[in-house]
């Protein structure tokens, strides 16, 4: 019985780890990367970013109300 509990707990920890990486860690890294490189990306890098946005869309949706990628305009009045 004890091995079943340990096995279930290990499975639960693995699932929580994978879900947190998929929904939290990689989308935040992707937001940071897009925010810093948006205006200087080449076409292949942009293609990779579009693929990653498609792949990690659920995590990006979680952070979209709090982060935005608006372009910085001139600070002239």
Swiss-Prot record:
GO CC term, one of those recorded: plasma membrane-derived thylakoid membrane
Subcellular location, record wording: Cellular thylakoid membrane
A Pfam family reported for this protein in Swiss-Prot or TrEMBL: NdhL
Entry EC no(s): 7.1.1.-
Protein topology in the membrane: Multi-pass membrane protein
Subunit structure as annotated in this protein's UniProt entry: NDH-1 can be composed of about 15 different subunits; different subcomplexes with different compositions have been identified which probably have different functions.
Descriptive protein name: NAD(P)H-quinone oxidoreductase subunit L
Naturally occurring in which organism (per UniProt): Prochlorococcus marinus subsp. pastoris (strain CCMP1986 / NIES-2087 / MED4)
Lineage of source species: Bacteria, Bacillati, Cyanobacteriota, Cyanophyceae, Synechococcales
């Amino acid at each position: 019985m004890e091995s079943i509990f340990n096995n279930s707990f290990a499975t639960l920890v693995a699932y929580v780890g994978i879900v947190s990486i998929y929904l939290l860690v990689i989308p935040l890294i992707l937001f940071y990367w897009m925010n810093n490189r948006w205006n200087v990306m080449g076409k292949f890098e942009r293609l990779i970013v579009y693929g990653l946005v498609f792949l990690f869309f659920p995590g990006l949706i979680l952070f979209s109300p709090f982060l935005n990628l608006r372009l910085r305009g001139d600070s002239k009045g």
